[in-house]
Regions:
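Lipid interaction determinants
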Residues: 1-44, 55-176
Length: 176
């Protein structure tokens, strides 16, 4: 069955990674928060997700690591309730399970800092994703991470981590 990006809104936890050498990692410490198109990945990157047929491509507007040699793209399919991603440019397979089916607001602001760096603030239900100023965080709106980042969104800017970030593009309803 085809996977539609619109079906993927919510918090996902990686249940399995199978590498090119057959190695397996079943640790569930990798999370991915998906909004309308915006996403934040706990491995340290964020940006817009694009879909071309059954292939999802994660564009990394914010990336804490140097760019890899290939685009981050995976062919997606359902195996029951498990979302299976198979590498397009690299040999791997990841199995994702929905960690939380979130109801409520879904919005994102693609940001620019005063020094020109990119950032992203998104919200899906009661969770938020932040990427910018050297950090990537997924947490609860109003929770300790939100408070520590000093996030204060408005229509045309977001105050966070001691800076005023300009909103370059937004999607969905209000983040606050």
């Amino acid at each position: 069955m085809d996977v539609l990006m619109a079906e993927c809104t919510g918090l996902w936890r990686r249940a399995l990674l199978v590498g090119a050498d057959g190695s397996r990692d079943a640790g569930g410490n990798v999370r991915w928060l998906q909004g309308i198109t915006a996403y934040v990945d706990s491995r340290g990157f964020a940006g817009p997700l694009h879909q071309h047929g059954n292939v999802f491509e994660w564009h990394r507007d914010v990336d804490l690591e140097p760019p890899g040699p290939f685009p981050d793209a995976g062919a997606m399919h359902w195996d029951g309730d498990v979302l299976v991603e198979t590498g397009v440019h690299e040999d791997y397979s990841e199995h994702w399970v929905r960690d939380a089916d979130l109801a409520g607001p879904c919005a994102a602001a693609f940001l620019r800092s005063p020094d020109g760096a990119r950032g992203l603030l998104m919200r899906v239900g009661d969770l938020f994703g932040w990427a910018g100023a050297g950090s990537v965080v997924i947490g609860a709106v109003g929770g300790v991470e939100w408070t520590n980042l000093r996030i204060a969104p408005s229509d045309d800017h977001v105050d966070a981590v001691g800076q005023r970030w300009s909103v370059e593009l937004s999607e969905g309803k209000s983040i606050s």
